[in-house]
Amino acid sequence: MSLAGICRRHLVAVGILGASLVGAALWLHSLWIWRGFTEYRMERDRDIPTAVAVGPDGAVWFTIDFADAIGVLRQDRIQRIQKGSENFEPLGLAVDRDGSAWYTDGPSRLISRMSPDGAVASFALSTPVAKLARMAAAPDGAVWFAEESTYSFTRLKDGAFTRHAVSTPGIAPFGVAVDASGAVWGTLPRANRLVRISARGEIAEFEPPTRAAQLGDVAVAADGAVWFLEMQANKIGRFAKGQFTEFPVPTRSAGLTALAIALDGAVWFTELRGQRLGRLRDGVITEFPLPQGDARPFGIAVDGAGNVWYTDLSGGLGRLSTERARGR
């Protein structure tokens, strides 16, 4: 299935798990605890947590599909903050150095920023239709996002948009990340390309060894290595010093949807169909089955302490503890 197909097929409502006890699991109101996992269930049955990002203050932000709100978890309490318009496939989310959450709002043709106190500032796109994918915050205070409707990687800084069109006509971008030097990395799923945009705006493209791999999310490690998902090929890819390395995921047709890098260098990813989180460390992939039988892990982020956060399309926000994440 194509990247777009996976996103659209699974961004639909599924049932909320009823209150029950499973083994050593503990259910406390909307809190579920089991073997290093903690899951916070959504209070509204229709809420579908989608993208997730962690701020410098430890706040965990997440978008909610088919809702007019953004969610944030602080001190084990979820707040549902109204934003004024309903989300549809809210795939873009990033938290800047000041702790403000930036998010894409395709139906309203906006890029918006929500400050820690909930104040919203929005910046209108000039296109009649806006189809938007992933987003990343840059060290210089800019935010970048993949603008599928204009086939561009777009920068927003001080209220001004700058578009960098991809060289292959009609090919929509998806993943986006910014490295420490300010260079932007992105993915072109249908073209099977990894893209680099230099600080001067020069664009270079690189093709991984596996054909038709369908590159998805992308992230840059502290050592400068670029990591990305190969959704169709069911692999995790690495690009460093001009060379590609690919790591097959043990679970077949896992449904790779999101990627994040921990401070210790471990690469974390979600397996939507496999109902697992995956960790790639020192060339070895370890999988962590989620505690709920109907789990659909979609977004992923790692906080400064090493806790791994993920969204569950079945209606939850989850955390894998640092101790469990760094173990075995």
Which sequence ranges carry the predicted segments?
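N-terminal Sec-pathway targeting helices
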Residues: 2-21
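Surface loop/turn motifs at the tips and blade-to-blade linkers of beta-strand repeat domains
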Residues: 41-45, 82-86, 124-128, 165-169, ...
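Beta-strand-rich domains and repeat architectures in extracellular enzymes and scaffolds
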Residues: 41-68
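Beta-rich catalytic cores
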Residues: 48, 66, 89, 107, ...
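Residue-level detector of Asp-centered blade-edge/turn motifs that repeat once per structural unit
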Residues: 54-57, 95-98, 137-140, 178-181, ...
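Conserved beta-strand positions in repeat-built beta-propeller and related beta-rich domains
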Residues: 60-66, 101-107, 143-149, 184-190, ...
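Blade-level signature of beta-propeller repeat domains, shared across WD40, Kelch, NHL, RCC1
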Residues: 296-328
